[in-house]
Amino acid sequence: LIDEGCHGVAVFGSTGQAQLLSVSEKISLLNELTKSKYKDNYLIGTGLNSLNETINFISISKSLGFNNFLIMPPAYYKYGDEDVFNYYSRIINTHQDIKIVLYNFEKLCGYKFSPECVNRLVKNFTSQIVGVKDSSYNLFETLKIDNFSILPGSESKLLKGLELGCSGIITA
C-alpha cells in the first residue's frame, strides 16, 4: 500500500478488531512489523480501556521503534471532556516523545470529542497531538487547527472532507 502512494497504515484500529486481540497478540504482530522498512509509516492503535495498559502498551511499542499512535478514549463508562483531557494528559506526561492521532468514534467508545476538547488538547500538547480520525463526523466540517490532520473515517466523507481541508482519510 505504501509503495502505491498511501502515506501510512493504521494497525489495530476498529476494523482490525483491536478490542478482540490480547496484548500478547498485538506485541507478536508488532514484532513482525519491526522487520518492515515502513515502520515509521505505521499508526499503532492501542484499543485498550485501561489507562495503565495503554501506557504500558505504548512503552512496549516504543521499545520496538513505533512512535505514532491512534488512541481512542476508554469505552463503556460515560466520560466528559475533562475526563478525556486528563486521560490523554496522563499518557503524554508519561510518553512525551510520541505522536497521537485522536480517535473520535462515539459508537464504539461512547464519547464524542467536542471541538473544545480537541482544541484544548492541541493547545496543551502541540508536539504530541497531531490529528484526529473522525468516525463520529462532528469535527471534520467545523474543526480548523493549523498543522493538524483531520481524517474522516469513511470513504463517503472523503470528497467533502478534502474540499473542507481535511488531510486525507483513515478507512478500511
Task: Please describe what each predicted stretch is.
Residues 2-112, 118, 123, 129:
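Active-site beta->alpha loop and helix N-cap motifs at the rims of alpha/beta catalytic domains
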Residues 92-94, 105-172:
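Catalytic alpha/beta core domains of metabolic enzymes, predominantly
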